[in-house]
Amino acid sequence: MRSIERLLSAATLTAALLTAMLVAGVTPAAAQAAADKITIRFTWKLKGEYAPLFVALDKGYYKAEGLDVTLAEGSGALTVIKMVGIGQEQFAYGPAVNAVQAVSQDLPVKIVSLYQASTPMGVISFPEVPLKSPKDLEGKSLAITTGETFSDMVRPFLKLNGVDIEKVTRVQMDNSARATQFMARRVDTMAVFLTNDLPKMEHVTKTKFNVIDVAAFGLKVPGAALIANSAWAEQNPELVRKVLRATAKGYADAMADPAAAAQTFQKYLTLKEDPGVLERQVRVTMASTNAPAGKPIGWTDEATWAACLDLLSETGNLKVRKALDAYYTNAYLQ
């Protein structure tokens, strides 16, 4: 009799749980199918160019793909890409050129989507400091942030433009110190991201700086990309596709309405940015987005990567050159 009572009690409890789940809109199958946890780690602190991914997160595009995505800050491209290579993270979001160099050094990572065909790097000076071409950097000091892309690219940039490297005083420091030193005019010039640093600096100083666009002077290397652990991507192709589909939707929305994307991103910032600066950052970033006609956002052709490898090889920044498919793939894009 007691066994029958226990069975009845268990059945009653099960029925109650099922009823509660159905009332809450959760089916037993859905309860078992937990969302796949994914971390996308940026290679730097939060900035306007990351807005499309937060749009995808905010609008539920990742969730709709069955993903539980965490968007996390980083502290430098080399560090974050290495974390992906050793399997500590699944994805890095940052400069493709650093991933290319990592692959050549046998780190098992691969670029699965490229969102900027060219890295928006620049060098600025105050109006009274002449700066029209790279040659003008001779005899001047140049502030560079440790861990940022240009710190690795400054030598090839100067070499490409016939600048005597020994005549340029390169001063490496952290991001906040770099800006402080430049604002106090203790350094003559400063390396910046045109999509992030420049809008902020111009807003703070109310100054129109002299600007060298690095890409316009020959150093055109692929920019923002999603970089995956190679083995993990091969073992989880559908998860990679889901991440790229959702991210592309965030990009499409941000391209269609940069102002709304900036407002969405602002919600996720602990330290709020000036709304005008943030909107300008997003607009400039969206204008540089790699969205080829008739192809998915993030798709690239072989010529882009061949040109990148040629440039890095010619300037001595690529010790070992591998086959193109070692560096990138379009296979996960739909």
Where are these regions (language model features)?
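Bacterial N-terminal signal peptides
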Residues: 10-25
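Secondary-structure end/capping motifs
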Residues: 235-315
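Short, glycine-/small- and polar/acidic-enriched structural segments
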Residues: 32-184, 188-195, 212-214, 220
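Pocket-lining segment of extracytoplasmic ligand-binding domains
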Residues: 97, 177-181, 185-271
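N-terminal secretory signal peptides that target proteins for export/translocation
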Residues: 1-6
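Sec/Tat signal peptide C-region and signal peptidase I cleavage site
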Residues: 26-32
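Short, surface-exposed acidic
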Residues: 165-169, 271-282, 318-326
